[in-house]
């Protein structure tokens, strides 16, 4: 038997190998023995760890001038991002892109709510009138998840406050037709505070009152805002919050189309304080989008333009040349999208990200992986291929902060979710030229051709729990790879220090759960 080498020579022996273990990104993407790749087709090989996960920075650039503390973006879909989603995305270090399947005035109002948001103050609470009933309160509790509702004379914000009703007032009340005035806490028994109070003082006042809600009123006793003890406890510290450097307001983006009336829409959004505009199209390489990019850069030079969607170098070059500051990558890869099936057009998402990012990185352009993101692993793979951010639609659709009501089936809570190419979205606003038809170039079609589906997704709870889980998961993944930041990850991939491995179908099965008769997959 031949003698083994001394263990002290292991590192020297390793140097004799001509190539590092695994594949470089060039080997992975530019091979000629396999078609396009998606996330489950490969893995990232582990590196060397000499730091703890908490030391990993996820700071990233989503566009030429916007840097965030996390790479998270919410998709401009009407069942994903409105003002509540955008507020909490920004508080947690990401940014929300408010959909445009609504009137320009409604969209601008949502942008304004995000910009005016101050942690803890609820500026658009649900408000009831004295004519509402106990049944109405119970319905709000079931569909919205809360029941502390102020009562005003006209049932609107800035109406004269007459009382407040909470879950304690109605939980044992059997007659659902009873007016809320018979069970509510009347105005004279309420503790309120005056408009203009600082959050710190209001917080202290709410704590001392030992109440769950604190109404904020003006000099005429009209309701102007509401404070919630639960929200205040959640909102005390957001160290990652995405804020502008000058005004310290939360950052927000919004989507528009490429029609002439979208220029009027953008004027309202800019007036509301928009930080970035996303030109929303399934196929971005069009004369319409190029013309729109040039017009925006000339008219609103301080607003970053995120263009797309693209999946090829040629598309990418066209939009960069027009002036795009960031690009969305993906065509037909979204969970609610059937473009590849119906149109036979698109590209596997991993290959699309790698090809676009390789070209766009030469120009300092943000690259946003948009579609196909189902878990933390997919995010890590997107970022390792050159993406600087990930956009989530279906992954966020079931959260508390997404628009829409809850549905309960067989004891499980769901929320509605639909692709913007679905028939439901195309017909949802009752307006022929809505955001969905514009996105898929079908405004003038007599017959609709769906490129998406609609349905229900399981309730995921609050973004306040879900996004920190994603953030921590990414930190641990980068630790396994051996890189301390996203910039370091991209640099290590470019230098071929980070290595990859293709997976066979059997290898994919091996990486899945095996051997259990039953199991619970609890992620956080």
Swiss-Prot record:
PROSITE patterns: CBS (PS51371), IMP_DH_GMP_RED (PS00487). GO terms for cellular component: cytoplasm; cytosol. The active site is at 337 (thioimidate intermediate), 439 (proton acceptor). Belongs to the IMPDH/GMPR family. GO terms for molecular function: IMP dehydrogenase activity; metal ion binding; nucleotide binding. The gene is gua1. Mycophenolic acid (MPA) is a non-competitive inhibitor that prevents formation of the closed enzyme conformation by binding to the same site as the amobile flap. In contrast, mizoribine monophosphate (MZP) is a competitive inhibitor that induces the closed conformation. MPA is a potent inhibitor of mammalian IMPDHs but a poor inhibitor of the bacterial enzymes. MZP is a more potent inhibitor of bacterial IMPDH. Pathway: Purine metabolism; XMP biosynthesis via de novo pathway; XMP from IMP: step 1/1. Homotetramer. Keywords: CBS domain, Cytoplasm, GMP biosynthesis, Metal-binding, NAD, Oxidoreductase, Potassium, Purine biosynthesis, Repeat. Its EC number is 1.1.1.205. GO terms for biological process: GMP biosynthetic process; GTP biosynthetic process. This is Inosine-5'-monophosphate dehydrogenase. Catalyzes the conversion of inosine 5'-phosphate (IMP) to xanthosine 5'-phosphate (XMP), the first committed and rate-limiting step in the de novo synthesis of guanine nucleotides, and therefore plays an important role in the regulation of cell growth. It comes from Schizosaccharomyces pombe (strain 972 / ATCC 24843) (Fission yeast). It is an enzyme of class 1 (oxidoreductase). Residues 121-180, 184-242 form the CBS domain. Pfam families: CBS, IMPDH. IMP binds at residues 335, 370-372, 393-394, 417-421, 451. K(+) binds at residues 332, 334, 337, 510-511. It catalyses: IMP + NAD(+) + H2O = XMP + NADH + H(+). InterPro entries: Aldolase_TIM (IPR013785), CBS_dom (IPR000644), CBS_dom_sf (IPR046342), IMP_DH (IPR005990), IMP_DH/GMP_Rdtase_CS (IPR015875), IMP_DH_GMPRt (IPR001093). It is found in: Cytoplasm.
């Amino acid at each position: 038997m031949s003698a083994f080498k001394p263990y002290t020579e292991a590192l020297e022996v390793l140097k004799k190998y001509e190539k590092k273990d695994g594949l470089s990104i060039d080997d992975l993407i530019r091979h000629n023995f396999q078609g396009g790749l998606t996330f489950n087709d490969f893995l990232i090989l582990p590196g060397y760890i000499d730091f703890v996960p908490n030391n990993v920075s996820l700071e990233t650039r989503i566009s030429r001038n916007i840097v965030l503390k996390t790479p998270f973006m919410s998709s401009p879909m009407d069942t994903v991002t409105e003002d509540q989603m955008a507020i909490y995305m920004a508080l947690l270090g990401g940014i929300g892109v408010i959909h445009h399947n609504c009137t320009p005035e409604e969209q601008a109002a949502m942008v304004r709510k995000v910009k005016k948001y101050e942690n803890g103050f609820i500026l658009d609470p649900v408000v009831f009138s004295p004519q509402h009933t106990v049944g109405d309160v119970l319905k709000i509790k079931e569909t919205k998840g809360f029941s502390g509702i102020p009562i005003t004379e006209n049932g609107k914000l800035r109406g004269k406050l007459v009382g407040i009703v909470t879950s304690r007032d109605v939980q044992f009340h059997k007659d659902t037709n009873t007016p809320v005035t018979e069970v509510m806490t009347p105005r004279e028994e309420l503790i309120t505070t005056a408009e203009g109070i600082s959050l710190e003082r209001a917080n202290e006042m709410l704590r001392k009152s030992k109440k769950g809600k604190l109404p904020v009123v003006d000099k005429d006793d009209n309701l102007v805002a509401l404070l919630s003890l639960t929200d205040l406890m959640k909102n005390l510290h957001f160290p990652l919050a995405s804020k502008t450097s000058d005004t310290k307001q939360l950052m927000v983006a919004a989507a528009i189309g490429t029609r002439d009336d979208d220029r009027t829409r953008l004027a309202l959004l800019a007036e509301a304080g928009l930080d970035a505009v996303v030109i929303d199209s399934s196929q971005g390489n069009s004369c319409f989008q190029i013309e729109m990019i040039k017009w925006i850069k000339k008219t609103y030079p301080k607003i970053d333009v995120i263009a797309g969607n693209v999946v090829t170098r040629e598309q990418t070059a066209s939009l960069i040349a027009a002036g795009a500051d960031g690009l969305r990558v993906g065509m037909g890869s979204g969970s609610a999208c059937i473009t590849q099936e119906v149109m036979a057009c698109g590209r596997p998402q991993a290959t699309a990200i790698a090809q676009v990012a390789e070209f766009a990185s030469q120009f300092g352009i943000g690259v946003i992986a948009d579609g196909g993101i189902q878990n933390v692993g997919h995010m890590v793979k997107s970022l390792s291929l050159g993406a600087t951010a990930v956009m989530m639609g279906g992954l966020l659709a079931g959260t508390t902060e997404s628009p829409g009501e809850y549905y309960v089936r067989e004891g499980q809570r769901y929320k509605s979710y639909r692709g913007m190419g679905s028939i439901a979205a195309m017909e949802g606003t009752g307006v022929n030229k809505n955001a969905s038809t514009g996105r898929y170039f079908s405004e003038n079609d007599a017959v609709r051709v769906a490129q998406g589906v609609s349905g229900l997704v399981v309730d995921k709870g609050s973004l306040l729990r879900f996004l920190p889980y994603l953030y921590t998961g990414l930190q641990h993944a980068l630790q396994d790879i051996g890189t301390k930041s996203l910039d370091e990850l991209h640099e290590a991939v470019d230098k071929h220090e980070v290595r990859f491995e293709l997976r066979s179908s059997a290898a994919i099965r091996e990486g899945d759960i095996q051997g259990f008769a039953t199991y619970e997959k609890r992620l956080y």
